[in-house]
Amino acid sequence: MWFHRRLGEILYAGCGVSRSEAGLRRALEEVRALREEFWADVKVVGGQARLNQELERALRVADFLELAEVMILDALDRRESAGAHFREEYATQGGEAQRNDEAWCSVSAWQTGPDGGHTRRSEPLSFSLVPMQVRDYR
């Protein structure tokens, strides 16, 4: 399906491992526009007499579009670099990830409200046996 492929291109360009605020904002706009286009143009063939794989695929793409938006919002909200989330604005002078454990040592969950808006909820993590430390891969 074209929408699925286009969504992958948007995410690869704007929300890959190396991310910037400008790229994330552009990706968010593109995903929202793609979702509007999807719902305006989606056509599902088949009937209800048996399993409709076209409907299943369309619903899966709809889920991917929503997940992509939340993933981008989360990356925008997270003002640090850590692991597979590298924000170009949050790097050391040597190009290494600049973590912010005080603010981001947590588990986040996003909730979609009745108006379609998204809210992040977070729960702090605690490490009692192993101290947190920055890993050096050099």
PLM region descriptions:
Residues 1-138:
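Glycine- and aromatic-enriched mobile tails/lids
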